[in-house]
């Protein structure tokens, strides 16, 4: 989504 939450290589 907006890049608000990132985990390892995944931003949502």
Swiss-Prot record:
A GO MF label: hormone activity
Superkingdom classification of source: Eukaryota
A Pfam family the protein falls into: Urotensin_II
Compartments (UniProt record): Secreted
Keyword ATP-binding included in the entry's annotation: no
InterPro entries assigned to the protein according to its UniProt record, in alphabetical order: Urotensin_II
A GO-annotated cellular component: extracellular region
Annotated S-S bridges: 6-11
Annotated signal sequence range: none
Major localization listed first in the record, in broad terms: secreted
Alphabetical keyword list: Disulfide bond, Hormone, Secreted
GO biological process: blood vessel diameter maintenance; regulation of blood pressure
Function per UniProt: Urotensin is found in the teleost caudal neurosecretory system. It has a suggested role in osmoregulation and as a corticotropin-releasing factor.
Family classification: Belongs to the urotensin-2 family.
Protein's name in the database: Urotensin-2A
